[in-house]
Amino acid sequence: MMAGVKVEAKNLKKSFGEREILHDVSFDCQPGESVVILGESGMGKSVMMRIVGMLLETTKGSVKIDDQEIVGITERAREKVMRKIGFLFQYSGLFDHLSVWENIMFYDLFIKKKDPHKMKEIAENLMKELGIPEQAIENKPSEISGGMQRRVALARTIVKKPSLILLDEPTTGLDPVICEVINNTINKTRQKTGATMLTITHDLNSALQIGDRIIVLRYGEIIFDGPAFDIFDAKDEYIKSFIKAANVNQKTLKV
């Protein structure tokens, strides 16, 4: 099992022109912790995650991964840090012309030019761990379900053994049963890898299923940061209305 990284973000501000998206945001993720950034669309969740993933520069503030400052980092140092990070984006981004196993092993197979037989064996083992049927190994993405595509994308993410996994709306567009399958797969992945996970979602049920901690973001400001189930004790009226609208049944969720 690999060790997860520590993430520290302090006083983040992000502006696009005159519009400020993040307002002096500070948060952290401890090694191996699963932190969920929860909020409606347009609240700044994706901006926060992209700054942590070095896909977007912050206007002001500091971000450290394992005590290394990544704001203003050199390109060489950036490449080294990026090796620690795995991304699972909202849309799987699988290559339609490649099989399931080729998608999973894309980097090692087509960039590193490693032995195809060994790569296929690694893919088979990972598929088994993530509940991807063996008979799907030669299928193209268009021949499998949306939920299965998410699992294939997750397999592609973790095959490089990242110590920080960033997940962008991993259950968006999936029915409730498949959402639960994906959330269980995410939890098993964290247990197996020990990776730190930072997830953004607007789905409170998913946040409670996969998060140790929940951060609620509203218009670029953090209005809640605490243990996942403590959100039910929050006094903020926006959070109360968010919980009511989500129609959460606590009895069906992990405790």
What feature does the model see in each segment?
Residues G53:
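Helix-to-loop junction immediately C-terminal to a conserved catalytic motif
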Residues H117-Q135:
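Conserved ABC ATPase "signature" region
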Residues K140-I144, M148:
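Conserved ABC ATPase signature
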Residues K161:
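Conserved catalytic motifs of ABC-family nucleotide-binding domains
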Residues I165-D168:
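Catalytic Walker B motif of ABC-type/P-loop ATPase nucleotide-binding domains
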